[in-house]
Amino acid sequence: MSEEKAVSTEERASRKVRVGYVVSDKMEKTIVVELEDRVKHKLYGKIIRRTTKVKAHDENGVAGVGDRVQLMETRPLSATKHWRLVEVLEKAK
């Protein structure tokens, strides 16, 4: 009797993708990226810019300060690193 194994094709949950600018590349295989979020003020309606700095994994060290990069959320790689570099969208001038 040969039984066929049920192949489970579980989809991964959708991961967050963000675009930001590299503000530091002094660590090995790690870059610090500033992400900008625009929110509307609850009462006055003015658009406010909020920025967050996150650490991202850059395996090959291709990103430099000032580069515009695309990040994707990933499993925790260290205590503070939860993002990885997908691609460099635009090199710094």
Curated annotation (Swiss-Prot):
Molecular function per GO: rRNA binding; structural constituent of ribosome
Entry keyword set: Ribonucleoprotein, Ribosomal protein, RNA-binding, rRNA-binding
Keyword Membrane in annotation: no
Keyword rRNA-binding recorded: yes
Function comment: One of the primary rRNA binding proteins, it binds specifically to the 5'-end of 16S ribosomal RNA.
PANTHER family assigned: 40S RIBOSOMAL PROTEIN S11 FAMILY MEMBER, SMALL RIBOSOMAL SUBUNIT PROTEIN US17M
Protein name: Small ribosomal subunit protein uS17
Species of provenance: Rhodococcus erythropolis (strain PR4 / NBRC 100887)
